[in-house]
Amino acid sequence: MPKALIVSAGNNANEYLAKHMVELGYTRPVMAASGGEARRQIDTKDFEVIIINAPLPDEFGHELGTDAVTKTDAGVILLTKAATADQIADKLQEFGVLVLGKPFTGAQFRQ
């Protein structure tokens, strides 16, 4: 069964993201509330997809994204405010991190 990691400090965002991940076939996404917690999960489990809802309480999240790309085979998506997404998308995409600006539609997320 494919595994997904959702890194987000917000309960509402967690529920929303988990719902969409279930629709994509990730039946029990693993949740992490911080970058540190996510790194511990990444060190002990294999994930197919890692979703980072920036900012996180202990870091912005772009560092976690680049770390995850270099340490795993997972696809990594960073969710951030649209204005910030425009500023960081090119740099992060060089590393292989997909950046999606918030707000976004369910259809955009599932793409």
Model regions and ranges:
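Negatively charged, flexible loop motifs adjacent to catalytic sites
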Residues: 34, 57, 82-86
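Alpha4 helix (beta4-alpha4-beta5 surface) of REC/receiver domains from two-component response regulators
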Residues: 63, 81-99
